[in-house]
Amino acid sequence: MNISKAKLLLLPPPLTPKLNRSLYSHSQRRTRSLPHHRDKPINWNSTHSFVLHNPLLSLLEKCKLLLHLKQIQAQMIINGLILDPFASSRLIAFCALSESRYLDYSVKILKGIENPNIFSWNVTIRGFSESENPKESFLLYKQMLRHGCCESRPDHFTYPVLFKVCADLRLSSLGHMILGHVLKLRLELVSHVHNASIHMFASCGDMENARKVFDESPVRDLVSWNCLINGYKKIGEAEKAIYVYKLMESEGVKPDDVTMIGLVSSCSMLGDLNRGKEFYEYVKENGLRMTIPLVNALMDMFSKCGDIHEARRIFDNLEKRTIVSWTTMISGYARCGLLDVSRKLFDDMEEKDVVLWNAMIGGSVQAKRGQDALALFQEMQTSNTKPDEITMIHCLSACSQLGALDVGIWIHRYIEKYSLSLNVALGTSLVDMYAKCGNISEALSVFHGIQTRNSLTYTAIIGGLALHGDASTAISYFNEMIDAGIAPDEITFIGLLSACCHGGMIQTGRDYFSQMKSRFNLNPQLKHYSIMVDLLGRAGLLEEADRLMESMPMEADAAVWGALLFGCRMHGNVELGEKAAKKLLELDPSDSGIYVLLDGMYGEANMWEDAKRARRMMNERGVEKIPGCSSIEVNGIVCEFIVRDKSRPESEKIYDRLHCLGRHMRSSLSVLFSEYEITNN
């Protein structure tokens, strides 16, 4: 850089009093080390004491304002210090990585230097990678490549930063291109570059390429194995994660706490308590660090695998409990149905953030206690904790459970009012809520408003249309889903087959059931078989339903046998119905519904003695019919009514009104029948 030009471009602004005093005090102490070189500046190198101990560089650490920074830069230009690579890179590093982060200005300085070194490029790229606009780091990388100077050639510090940005933004294809540059520069043998590329692919869910890079590299270390294990865990391939660990063991690589987090979390996904205990024993026997993330993973594993007492023991022994620790225990108790214990822990927390509220609300939804979930949501609002997307999803699920349409509409308005992004997850929850609460037209409206749809979105609308008996429209959305290149899953087919069942579309149902395996490589589960048996049973094709059950690769459960019994009662097939009832009573002799169906089937076949026997068997076994429960939403409050319930204070008035309504209905029906007879005579 030409110094005279630099002085014209950036004359030093007047020094602020504070900075002026600092410069003066430094210059008094180092009068010999700060000569003026306005005419012939020395090309200082980084070993020269003038550079290493220059007061201008030490003042950088005290900068709080861009104005101060510019004053120091101006003095560096005047004194020739800016020409030293070490000094200029220190200035750029401060701009890019300091707390204040003057990123745009760091680029200006970088471009003003004739041959910036690789350190200057790397710190600026890193600064942008940690900013609100990390994609800018790729543009800077392209500029660095165009610069073409051998001093600014990318090195083994450049690529881990770029791979991390690709990982954070899920840019697998761009990461693949950058990997090509790494191979060209022969940097793949540097372990931290190699590991960063594996981590990038794993973070993007691209385990095929992650495994390929891993297999082809001669520099595997513990970090490489951990990237692979945790990558498989992240995409739900828990068995593969454990398999990779076994390979790691066979190569003599010892695990650490990060390895164990991946393995313990994999056991949580599989519900494998025994293997989880084995890994826990390994941690204790080999003295691995019990880090907070590992302890939280162990608590989560024990609670999800049904050993909530061991999870609580670990929790109670924790010296320092994080918000994640509390959330894990609260979620664990809620998952086990121990909502009262969960609530006590929740109340013990002094400071509750949105994650903790979400754990409590989500636990209530999971335990099918929708009213409690919505009550918690109201408490959350009074506590001035701002709900997030997860809160809304949990609350919409609660509305779906209760059929609370008014509350669901209020939540929808809340989302719109506070401009929460209607992404796939939130949009899908709204579609599901409207469909299950009876407003299919609004469900369709929300569906069409979602810009990017996935299999869950289509599954929600297909299931909703099936629930409303609109089989043909459900099938049309399934076809649209396939045309869009979105693969259906097992839950999609539950909605699709249910639509065929409600619409009486027997052959279409057969075809889709067959296509599950032949076209989409999906294995039908018990739920799919129960829907098919229901479809065939309702159509009177009971022998075909029986043959389908015999061909099942697994034992039929109560839902499958129940569907067959219902069809037998509907069409009067007593022999096959008795076979189904016998199996059902073996599975659960306390289920009152079996006796009721059996009694009804015998009654419709005029087999009164057998009907009496079914009722007598029910009484002898002490089985009582579970009373039905209905709910109604009034002014946003969901009220539940149980059959023959007289616990309410106004029960007498309620039953009087019901009797009155019953009389009116009977008299209205009598009038209708009389008019019908007159018309037809």
From Swiss-Prot:
Region Type E motif, annotated ranges: 560-635
Region span, Type E(+) motif: 636-666
Transit peptide per record: 1-32
An annotated GO cellular component: mitochondrion
Subcellular location: Mitochondrion
Family: Belongs to the PPR family. PCMP-E subfamily.
PROSITE patterns: PPR (PS51375)
Source species, domain of life: Eukaryota
Any GO molecular function: RNA binding
GO biological process: RNA modification
Protein name according to UniProt: Pentatricopeptide repeat-containing protein At2g22410, mitochondrial
Extent of the PPR repeats: 117-151, 155-189, 190-220, 221-255, 256-290, 291-321, 322-356, 357-387, 388-422, 423-453, 454-488, 489-519, 525-555
Pfam families in the cross-refs: E_motif, PPR, PPR_1, PPR_2
Record key words, sorted: Mitochondrion, Repeat, Transit peptide
This protein's record includes keyword DNA-binding: no
